[in-house]
Amino acid sequence: GKNDAPAQASRPLSASAAGFIPGSGSGVLMLESLDSARARGARIWAEVLGGFVNCGGHRQGGSMTAPNPTSVQRCIRGAVAMAGILPRDIGLINGHLTATFADPHEVENWRAALELSAEQLPLIQSTKSLIGHALGAAGGIECVASVLQVARGFAHGSLNCEDLHPEVARFASSVVHQTREVPELSVIAKASFGFGDVNGCVIFKKYSA
């Protein structure tokens, strides 16, 4: 266990992951039409290009804690289509990635949904490696993290996954281990594949006046 080393306890994508670590907090974003925000001179952090929500119906392996892979992939594809972008436009994936058995399946679902090879997968990260799993608040917090990254041109590291899960190893070049500047970052995909086989994915774009 990691009781004596709490900073190493949350281990998404790791071969030694032993389940999610509860966290807490909140994340709030104000959504506003672009015309309204411009008219009042608001600071615009990012644009929401599109999103998609669905449920796997507890079928094809889906359950209270496991996602239906077909529905996960349909959710990702739906968000990309609604955003009007191509898979190659995505520069960073902020995944659900919880340090459970589902992590390798999630990474493969991203690859399959985007119809890319392992080498072509965008950068991928887990905010839960930094703060744990805030349950109902996780998606909001991770949306804030996503917006900050696309606005400021960086990707935060995923901690504690130096020992990548064997099924994730082929995606090693995409896993962000250390925080780094990514000045060319313009589109980020944020997803939550939560309890009850419920899925959500949103596409954020860097705002350019």
Where are these regions (language model features)?
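Acidic-glycine-rich active-site phosphate/pyrophosphate-binding loop
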Residues: 1-8, 106-124, 173-178
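Condensing-enzyme catalytic core mediating Claisen C-C bond formation in acyl metabolism
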Residues: 5-85, 91-92, 209
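Short glycine/threonine-rich loop-to-helix capping motif typified by GTGT followed
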Residues: 58-69, 97-115, 134-141, 173
